[in-house]
Amino acid sequence: MKYLLLPAALGLWTAPVVADVPQAPARFDSRFVQTRSLPGFSAPLTSHGVMRFDKQHGFYWEITDPYHYVFQMGSAGASETLPDGSVRQLDPAETPWLAAVQHIIVNALSGDRSDLQRYFQVVVTPLPRGERVDLTPRQGPMSEAIVDIRVTESAPGHPQLIEIKETSGDHMDIRFIPSAP
């Protein structure tokens, strides 16, 4: 569940930003470097991949190195492709946190960014270029896995860095690198 929840949480961020801000792009496409610090490990784990989000196709998260993993979520549901190549369909009715994520994204795509406040305490801090948004999960499925999420963006719909602190003590930083046009 934890591996699915974190990419899905990223979808929470990109969907409302794209839906709410008129000048935001209708699509977000980026490469990323993910650095994960785990209690008990002397060095962080680093992976590389691509992330895409658009209203028509939904959310796509692919780790390309050092292993292959894909998480996809759209109007038809969600699935993951594991490193061994097996594909698993995820049913929101059987996965409460996924149902919550899908609800937030559907509302965000209809232009309701305020729905984030139903699931998170939201604090927005203006920066010289862009803003930082701190999301602290309210009581519920997400609060069982995530302590908080901090998003730094350069412009509306353009996250540069997402920092995720997990209840297990894990910490993940995801730095986005814009894809070539």
Regions found by a protein language model. Give the residues of each.
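N-terminal signal peptide c-region/cleavage motif recognized by signal peptidases
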Residues: 13-16
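Positively charged n-region of N-terminal signal peptides that target proteins for export
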Residues: 1-3
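Extended lipid/amphipathic-ligand handling interfaces
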Residues: 49-53, 151-154
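Flexible, processing/modification-adjacent segments and terminal tails
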Residues: 20-37, 41-44, 81-138
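Gly/Pro-enriched, hydrophobic low-complexity segments
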Residues: 113, 117-119, 126-181
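Amphipathic hydrophobic-ligand
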Residues: 43-49, 148, 170
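Short beta-strands and strand-coil junctions in structured, solvent-facing domains, enriched
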Residues: 38-39, 67-69, 141-142
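An acidic-aromatic
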Residues: 50-103, 172
